[in-house]
Amino acid sequence: MRHCLLLAALTLSPLASASATDAPPRYGAQLEGFAYPYPVHWYRFDSQRQPLQMAYMDVAPTGTPNGRTVVLLHGKNFCAATWESTIAALVAQGYRVLAPDQIGFCKSSKPQAYQFSFAQLAANTHALLQQAGVTRAAIVGHSMGGMLAAHYALQYPQDVSQLLLVNPIGLEDWKAAGVPWRSVDDWYAKERKTDAASIKQYQQTVYYGGQWKPEYDRWVSMQAGLYAGPGGDRVAWNQALTSDMVFNQPVVQRFPQLRVPTTLFIGQRDRTAIGKDLAPPALAATLGDYPALGKRAAAAIPGARLVAFDDLGHSPQVEAPQRFNTALLEALGTAP
């Protein structure tokens, strides 16, 4: 791949905060119009015979630098901006933080044709880090980003100081469990129906155990604004392609092969499971059991440590940022 690095800091404006009950804003296909909490840079490269660009934040320490770097990988229904409070906590303690948007998501390119795989996304991320001068880092992944982080640690173990998984999806193999297959075309049709109301309903039910706080509305508006904007069709198509990737590329069977210090942070009220809506009721009732899945994953990963948040759901860093940040910093402090 041909690589070059273009640093283009965006002018920051007040962060979007529309209520999820209001008509969502209309953002561009690369989330134009939604301001990130720190300057955004662009990593430009060629992949699969096309030019692409990855957006990312590269935030320097505000506290005394400790010489360590943390990479934050977002989930499928999230963006790098969702790590806002985590970034602030990390840089205050002297860490350099990089938070990219993966290809197909948020402010990054959304190709019409791309062979999405976790190996490819890991390679893209690794190349970005090399260009940024990062040779070794702690990798933190949330939701789909947790699946990616696990693949990354398997693919580049020598470059990972720690692996920290925050309610990762992929702690079970849904297809092997019996969840029916869904075509990319069907995923796309489902994605085209996505709006602010459906996003909020899903997150409230699956992520937050039926509860809701006004501060979550901002993230609903961010996601809904992508679908409502002029690039909504391209956004839905990329979401369909990546849903197919997530469903068909399990990582749980490879957990025993991980050879890096690993910590799992598991909100116990999480019930996320890809394709649960297709599963027979009896099967669906067994999927996304994060209290059990977290324990099973910790047992499968050599030397893994489990941090359970009994009263939290899928996004501890959003739901209780101070508690999560304290736990994350404690885990990072155990690095050899």
Residue ranges and their predicted role:
Residues A150, L154, L163-T194:
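Flexible "cap/lid" loop of the alpha/beta hydrolase fold
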